[in-house]
Amino acid sequence: MFNKILLATDGSDHSIRATEKAIALASCQKNGSIEVVYVIDGKQSKDDVLQHWGTDAAIHRKKKLLLIEQKIKHAKINYTIHYLHGEPGPMIVKHANEHQFDAVVIGSRGLNTLQEMVLGSVSHKVAKRVKCPVMIVK
């Protein structure tokens, strides 16, 4: 049922929990696979470059995904990693809808009601606009 799973991640603890759920879903299928997507937000990318001035920003991003990649490898699930550029919510939605995934798994930061109203929630934006089932992991 869920052969092709998109795992939207930012390398956070919430993403690690989402990874575990994506692995569980993919493991239920003989040919289950996970596509890990990390969106490089222009604003955030600028902050990363300034903060990691002496290091390569690409290496810093890969380190963020290292534990996620190790967990998927350990589970012996086929996977790919894609880096997208833009605003996370719309980019995840666009990628998911264009590539016809069976499910999207994404972590939630657990914003309170006020924060969610002011800032918006990437996970809720994705859930509203993606054309396949979405699992939001707390």
Residue ranges and their predicted role:
Residues R17, M91, T113:
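Phosphate- and divalent-cation-binding pockets in alpha/beta enzyme and binding domains
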Residues A26, I68-I72, A96:
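Conserved hydrophobic residues forming the short capping helix/wall of the S-adenosyl-L-methionine
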Residues E35-V37, T80-L84, M135:
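General small-molecule cofactor/ligand-binding pocket signal
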Residues K73-V104:
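Structural beta-alpha unit
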Residues M1-H52, A75:
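Small/aliphatic-rich secondary-structure junction motif
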